[in-house]
Amino acid sequence: KCFEVGEFCGSPMLLGSLCCYPGWCFFVCVG
């Protein structure tokens, strides 16, 4: 899972987490 900005994630994350798409985390997914 992705919790920190700049962390890499390889799969879509759940609502409320820092990523909603594969890649680098830069925002919180809200919808």
Curated annotation (Swiss-Prot):
Keywords: Disulfide bond, Knottin, Secreted, Toxin. Expressed by the venom duct. Disulfide bonds join 2-20, 9-25, 19-29. It is found in: Secreted. The keyword Disulfide bond applies. GO terms for cellular component: extracellular region. Signal peptide: none annotated. Transmembrane segments: none annotated. Belongs to the conotoxin O1 superfamily. The cysteine framework is VI/VII (C-C-CC-C-C). This is Conotoxin pc6d. The lineage of its organism: Eukaryota, Metazoa, Spiralia, Lophotrochozoa, Mollusca.
